[in-house]
């Protein structure tokens, strides 16, 4: 079955900063009722998405014969071959009421105008690395006339979806951030992010951290500029990083919370002084949480680790495992975002996968058709 995409200019748009956009949904919104299929981080892997939808029983318009509906956990786009096709398909499915989609950190990076090589398919389509022979020559670039619609769509996405039996978020169920968003109304993700950024930067300036951070960056400029620099742990830079993460509700829900690193490490083109806080180890609520973001492995035998940042989970955890003291948190990101690395090595048999968690069945389905009965610490309907 062919699942195709086409632009959907007929969506109902309003105006925001001169950009046509869909109306804003609440930041904390109600999840679909009934049976749903929660799809992990797609990262521009359109063929994997197409294969997974077939395995789940959806037609090319996102309809299911049993009335099931889709929820995308975020990170639609990245270094996969066809981020535009993924975004277009999801936009259409959301507009038709057949899917919901959360904001992921990769969509947030595009919204706030970050300049990273992994975003060049969108921010700099003419870059040499996107041309034949370049590092990202495999990536289809965004059609220029669709940029505004993509940004508008990302700006309108909820950050949290919830219902009585389930919570959905891209990276972290962080109560302080969620409470703040409940009170925020519907200003849009970019406006929320910018307001938090302005408040945080003012506080850092007042505390003198901004000046100390600048001094550390200047003193260690050569070490910070590339992945081989091995800078020391810089206290002002670390504190600034933590505040920009933990005090910004949009960021902490899409990137996950940070804590002070034991030593600096280099990932996503920069040195980090903070590392991931394993928040799931302290989650004691009864309501299950499904998230993405954390580059989980599907295979656990030696030599099958997906290329990624430092591992977030016990590397021996298999795909059936739930996390947390009550075993009621599930990460549905099975590292398909690293498939571009596998291709660069000439691999055609992939160890990274795109998965979906079927709710309430608690079954994992991956794009190859493998079905895994997961093992939650609760009884699901």
Indicate where each model-derived feature is located.
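Acidic, His/Gly-rich catalytic cores of divalent-metal-dependent hydrolytic chemistry
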Residues: 187-381
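Active-site-proximal beta-strand elements of phosphoester/diester hydrolases
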Residues: 35-43, 166-172, 330-332
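A short acidic-Thr-Gly-centered motif at the start of a beta-strand
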Residues: 23-32, 63, 88-95, 159-162, ...
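Residue-level marker for buried hydrophobic side chains located in beta-strands
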Residues: 38, 70-72, 101-102, 167, ...
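Active-site environment of divalent metal-dependent phosphoester hydrolases
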Residues: 45-46, 78-81, 106-112, 161, ...
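Divalent metal-coordination and catalytic microenvironments
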Residues: 41, 75, 104-105, 154, ...
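Active-site neighborhood of divalent metal-dependent phosphoester bond hydrolases
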Residues: 67, 80-225
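N-terminal active-site segment of His-dependent metallophosphoesterases
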Residues: 3-88
């Amino acid at each position: 079955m062919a699942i195709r995409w086409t632009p959907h200019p007929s969506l109902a748009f309003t105006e925001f900063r001169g950009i046509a956009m869909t109306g804003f949904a609440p930041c904390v919104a109600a999840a679909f009722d009934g049976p749903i299929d929660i799809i992990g981080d797609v990262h521009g892997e359109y063929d994997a998405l197409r294969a997974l939808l077939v395995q789940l029983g959806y037609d090319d318009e996102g309809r299911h014969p049993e009335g099931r509906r889709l929820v995308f956990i975020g990170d639609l786009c990245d270094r996969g071959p066809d981020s535009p096709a993924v975004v277009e398909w999801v936009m259409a499915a959301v507009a038709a009421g057949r899917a919901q989609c959360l904001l992921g950190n990769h969509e947030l990076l595009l919204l706030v105008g970050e300049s990273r090589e992994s975003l060049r398919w969108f921010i700099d389509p003419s870059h040499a690395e996107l041309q034949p022979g370049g590092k990202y020559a495999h990536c289809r670039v965004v059609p220029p006339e669709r940029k505004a619609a993509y940004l508008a769509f990302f700006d309108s996405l909820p950050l949290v979806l919830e219902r009585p039996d389930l919570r959905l978020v891209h990276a972290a169920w962080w109560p302080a951030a969620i409470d703040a968003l409940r009170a925020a109304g519907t200003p849009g993700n970019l406006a929320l992010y910018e307001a938090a950024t302005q408040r945080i930067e003012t506080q850092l300036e007042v505390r003198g951290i901004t000046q100390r951070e600048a001094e550390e960056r200047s003193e260690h400029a050569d070490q910070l500029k590339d992945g081989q620099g091995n800078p020391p742990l810089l206290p002002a830079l670390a504190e600034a990083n933590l505040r920009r993460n933990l005090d910004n509700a949009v960021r902490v829900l899409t990137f996950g919370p940070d804590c002070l690193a034991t030593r600096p490490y280099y990932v996503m083109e920069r040195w980090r002084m903070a590392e991931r806080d394993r928040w799931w180890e302290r989650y004691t609520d009864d309501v299950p949480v499904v998230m993405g973001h954390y580059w989980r492995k599907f295979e656990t035998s030696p030599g099958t680790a997906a290329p990624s940042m430092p591992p977030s989970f016990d590397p021996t955890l298999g795909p059936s495992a739930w996390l947390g003291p009550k075993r009621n948190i599930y990460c549905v990101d099975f590292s398909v975002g690293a498939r571009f690395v596998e291709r660069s090595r000439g691999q055609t048999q992939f160890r990274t996968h795109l998965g979906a968690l079927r709710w309430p069945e608690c079954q994992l389905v991956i794009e190859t058709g493998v079905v895994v009965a997961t093992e939650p610490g609760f009884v699901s309907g």
